[in-house]
Amino acid sequence: MNGVVLPGDSTVQYVEVSVPEPGHGQVLLEMKASSICGSDIRAIYRQHLGTGPEAYQGVVAGHEPCGQVVAVGPGCRRLSVGDRVVVYHIAGCGVCEECRHGYMIGCTSPSRAAYGWQRDGGHAEYLLAEEATCIVLPEPLTYVDGALVSCGFGTAYEGLLLATRRRH
């Protein structure tokens, strides 16, 4: 399949990558929409790449993906083939305190990875996603709607969860 990577120097590259197969707790999505965030623009111009494990790792870009489930790995219980989903942009470890409270962006594990930055994102024909990061897209919304709200809405929602948790 084809995918887009961000090598820097004000360029993007269209590359050939393998179609992944879902493992335990994972789903394979056929991408229907994947928007471009300001972070992506800054990465293209090398103004925002991060450092160390938080840096862009040369993977398929796109942390605002939306698609349809085409394969389900073992252990998945919520999603089925044909489901329309938005993908939250951070895959946490699922076991640290932040993840257990639903705040994956605050995951403290070295395994925390952002789609399109540390693991392949949505700018390809297919995306391998953790079932835990997928949110069913309500029928009135289009795939483009889902892609446009995936990063910004998810970040705001997690901020509200964190603020509520700290008040109690």
Q: What are the functions of these language-model segments?
A:
Residues 1-4:
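Short structural boundary motif marking the start of a folded domain
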Residues 7, 18-19, 56-62, 114-119, ...:
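Short Gly/Pro-enriched turn/cap motifs at secondary-structure boundaries
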Residues 10-14, 38-39:
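Short N-terminal binding/cap micro-motifs at the start of the first secondary-structure element
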Residues 20-34, 48-100, 133, 138-141:
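Glycine-rich beta-strand-centered segment in the early N-terminal region that forms part
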Residues 39-45:
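Cytochrome P450 core scaffold surrounding the K-helix E-X-X-R motif
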Residues 41, 78-79, 107-110:
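Short, solvent-exposed secondary-structure boundary/capping segments
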Residues 93-168:
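NAD(P)H dinucleotide-binding glycine-rich loop of Rossmann-like/cofactor-binding domains
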